[in-house]
Regions:
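General beta-strand structural signal in soluble alpha/beta enzymes
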Residues: 44-45, 67-68, 99-102, 163-166
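Alpha-helix/helix-capping structural signal
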Residues: 71, 104-105, 170, 177
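Residue-level recognition of the N-termini of beta-strands and the immediately preceding loop/turn
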Residues: 10-11, 97
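C-terminal and late-domain segments of enzyme folds
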Residues: 1-8, 14-35, 65, 113-115, ...
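Hydrophobic anchor at the start of a short beta-strand
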Residues: 40-42, 99, 191
């Protein structure tokens, strides 16, 4: 929120396309803002079964921050393209609107990354918006899926471009197309730069995120 340049009264648009505009997700997000940040003006852009605002471009350009929900990145990007959202999002980005999101809401801005949108297995997704010229490996420390291994294998074989992986609780802050810093709400979590090594394998570099001071106690995120 601080990246908007405002301390209070930010105008935020929540975009839950990746979860099919789930009423449960919408209620959870709007309730969280109402409880924790009642000063924030929160709108919701739904696209099922038709857009919830008369002019998508005008509405999004009026926001300080666009927050994209996680879920199916394949469905998200397909629906966005049907409604002309990639062009609108680029216009917002170039106008200085902060673009944000987690999971699919992070992956969508990149070139691609592993996804379980097609089924239980992890498959390469290469149809991201590509605003950021990197791949993105989200949930890099998941125990129930081999996301770490899959992301690195896809980069090693050339299916995905070099990019950034993030363990849960880590965010990537870009300025333009340059990574400014990684931040985290989990002090032990890491981000990683991963690239092909030219010999059929990969090379990686650990990135130690800046811990967000107000959220540095891991106990806050248990349960």
């Amino acid at each position: 929120m601080g990246l908007t340049g405002k301390d209070r009264g930010q105008r935020v648009c929540y975009v839950p396309t990746a979860v099919g505009d789930s009423p449960v997700a919408i209620e959870a997000m709007t309730s969280t803002f109402a409880t924790q940040r009642p000063d924030v003006d929160v709108s919701v852009l739904c696209l099922f079964n038709q857009p919830s605002v008369p002019d998508i471009c005008e509405h999004l350009l009026s926001r300080d921050l666009i927050l994209v929900e996680g879920g199916s990145v394949v469905n998200l990007v397909a629906v966005w393209r049907a409604h002309g959202l990639p062009e609108v999002m680029r216009e917002c980005w170039e106008a200085g609107v902060v673009l944000a999101g987690a999971s699919a809401g992070s992956l969508c801005w990149h070139q691609g990354g592993p996804t379980d949108s097609f089924g239980d297995s992890l498959d390469p997704f290469t149809e991201g918006l590509g605003f950021l010229p990197f791949s993105n490996g989200v949930h890099d420390d998941f125990d129930d899926q081999p996301r770490r291994e899959t992301y690195r294998a896809l980069i090693a074989e050339g299916t995905l471009s070099a990019g950034y992986a993030t363990e849960d609780g880590v965010g990537l802050h870009y300025v333009g197309t340059r990574l400014h810093e990684a931040v985290t709400i989990r002090p032990a979590a890491r981000a990683w730069w991963v690239e092909a090594d030219g010999a059929g394998g990969y090379a990686e570099r650990s990135i130690v995120p800046r811990v967000l001071a107000a959220l540095a106690d891991d106990r806050t995120f248990q349960g």
